[in-house]
Amino acid sequence: MAPLGSSTVFLLALTIIASTRALTPTHYLTKHDVERLKASLDRPFTNLESAFYSIVGLSSLGAQVPDAKKACTYIRSNLDPSNVDSLFYAAQASQALSGCEISISNETKDLLLAAVSEDSSVTQIYHAVAALSGFGLPLASQEALSALTARLSKEETVLATVQALQTASHLSQQADLRSIVEEIEDLVARLDELGGVYLQFEEGLETTALFVAATYKLMDHVGTEPSIKEDQVIQLMNAIFSKKNFESLSEAFSVASVAAVLSHNRYHVPVVVVPEGSASDTHEQAILRLQVTNVLSQPLTQATVKLEHAKSVASRATVLQKTSFTPVGDVFELNFMNVKFSSGYYDFLVKVEGDNRYIANTVELRVKISTEVGITNVDLSTVDKDQSIAPKTTRVTYPAKAKGTFIADSHQNFALFFQLVDVNTGAELTPHQTFVRLHNQKTGQEVVFVAEPDSKNVYKFELDTSERKIEFDSASGTYTLYLIIGDATLKNPILWNVADVVIKFPEEEAPSTVLSQNLFTPKQEIQHLFREPEKRPPTVVSNTFTALILSPLLLLFALWIRIGANVSNFTFTPSTIIFHLGHAAMLGLMYVYWTQLNMFQTLKYLAILGSVTFLAGNRMLAQQAVKRTAH
């Protein structure tokens, strides 16, 4: 352990806690997530639609497909000039590729213009308008807007409204787009909030992401701030980026699109503040490093980062305020070596400025500042109970073990005194865990006591054998005394073998056998006492009762033998066979009811069997009556 007066050592553990001022992003795209998203988009083309998702999605992330010329050739060869959807995918994908131009005939142009009609679906209108825009062809925006508005009144789904927003972003700014812009507020009202952290449509992640991307693209186009609150933007962001693996290309494309617009738009840019590992664990410096990025983990190097204040969690006292972070490469650093922080937890309120578009730019970090504990003024004493002899005191220095042994018996007590200090500052410490453990060297018995500080923060442990005999089970012997010190803010928890103490209890109180009190020994098996079975009647009684139950059956057989059973009239007609089988089945059902079924199940089966048996019996008796009449 470092001696007193050595250089300061700080160990910081950083956690982002919920700020009372605003929501903070809980989900965003880390650099690893961005690469995984790119990998999800970079797939072989299976059709023109997949090529669109892959090319435009990668372009949103600032990447390109591996072979742009090959991709352009694929688009040209798979384009169907008579299909509006095919033209849309080709136009948008070719725009994302440099030097990829696609020529369009007049017939194709007329096809696209004809699709911009209220007789077409919203999807068809969107694809036609976007294709015309992508190919650089002229379009009557006001007429397209009228067709879109008329069709939207018939399709009131969330996806149709989102596609209307996407369509409007391709129309001229001179057109009156207010009716479409007003749909944004209606869509926001239809969002579902989950736990105050997430906001999404019940249609799922893809629709939610397309809505956010379309909203900001349209608002950038018309030059109006979207009617979405900053907290709602963060909730939408948390919902969209909470998913890291994507089932389809379209889903990955939607996430890439929203990541692009939230990173670069004219109104709202969410800020992500992430601590970079832990602070420097050295004797020379204590530095808090923060990564300040957008949702794509791209550094906001032009930002300014300030510490508003740092408060102790325990006392709420402000220990540091109004301090700027220093930009170093892609991170921001705060060196607070010169500030006298005592060990404990602190809340650092950090604010990111430099752009009025920043949202979620105030974050609160919980910082744990650890230190090293030192043990000083350690005195071991034996004190005579009658005080006729002066106490014998031995001072010991950590981590050495005291020489010799100390005795505690009916005539003298044993006492331990010590103080705990901060090695770095010399201030007194009161850790959460300060224990004295006594371990019997022969039996393995362990007894643990809590050492408490007095008003002067001097820890004292006194062993009086007359008062502590219950804890020790009056087991005399040589005990090893350990001092245990621990705390979440201590860098060097201590387990110190301080001394050997001989403890003597009066012999008449000592147990004949000493059971180990080791906490880790197997416990004695618990013997359960179950209720004794009830007495049963004698075998004679049970046999007699069984015979009485069977007596009617025996009587039936006896009468049949005496009178004679008339089986000559038995006929093998279906009704006769079904009747007797049904009767036998009902008797069998009674047995099953007794062993397995409940009353309601039995009644259900009995209704079926009874109906069949009744009908068969009625038919059988009718046949017998006809037979008698004939004779």
UniProtKB/Swiss-Prot annotation:
UniProt-annotated glycosylation sites, renumbered to this chain: N106
Pfam families per record: Ribophorin_II, Ribophorin_II_2nd, Ribophorin_II_3rd, Ribophorin_II_C
GO cellular component: oligosaccharyltransferase complex
Cytoplasmic topological domain residue ranges: 562-576, 618-631
Gene Ontology biological-process annotations: protein N-linked glycosylation
Lineage: superkingdom: Eukaryota
UniProt keyword list: Endoplasmic reticulum, Glycoprotein, Isopeptide bond, Membrane, Signal, Transmembrane, Transmembrane helix, Ubl conjugation
Predominant location category: endoplasmic reticulum
Signal sequence, start to end: 1-22
Membrane topology classification: Multi-pass membrane protein
This protein's pathway: Protein modification; protein glycosylation
Transmembrane segments: 541-561, 577-597, 605-617
InterPro entries, alphabetized: Ribophorin_II_2nd, Ribophorin_II_3rd, Ribophorin_II_C, Ribophorin_II_N, Swp1
Location in the cell: Endoplasmic reticulum; Endoplasmic reticulum membrane
Coiled-coil positions: none
Keyword S-adenosyl-L-methionine part of the UniProt annotation: no
Function statement: Subunit of the oligosaccharyl transferase (OST) complex that catalyzes the initial transfer of a defined glycan (Glc(3)Man(9)GlcNAc(2) in eukaryotes) from the lipid carrier dolichol-pyrophosphate to an asparagine residue within an Asn-X-Ser/Thr consensus motif in nascent polypeptide chains, the first step in protein N-glycosylation. N-glycosylation occurs cotranslationally and the complex associates with the Sec61 complex at the channel-forming translocon complex that mediates protein translocation across the endoplasmic reticulum (ER). All subunits are required for a maximal enzyme activity.
Subunit and partners: Component of the oligosaccharyltransferase (OST) complex. OST exists in two different complex forms which contain common core subunits RPN1, RPN2, OST48, OST4, DAD1 and TMEM258, either STT3A or STT3B as catalytic subunits, and form-specific accessory subunits. STT3A complex assembly occurs through the formation of 3 subcomplexes. Subcomplex 1 contains RPN1 and TMEM258, subcomplex 2 contains the STT3A-specific subunits STT3A, DC2/OSTC, and KCP2 as well as the core subunit OST4, and subcomplex 3 contains RPN2, DAD1, and OST48.
PANTHER family noted in UniProt: DOLICHYL-DIPHOSPHOOLIGOSACCHARIDE--PROTEIN GLYCOSYLTRANSFERASE SUBUNIT 2, RIBOPHORIN II
Protein name: Dolichyl-diphosphooligosaccharide--protein glycosyltransferase subunit 2
UniProt organism field: Pongo abelii
Organism taxonomic ancestry: Eukaryota, Metazoa, Chordata, Craniata, Vertebrata
Gene expressing this chain: RPN2
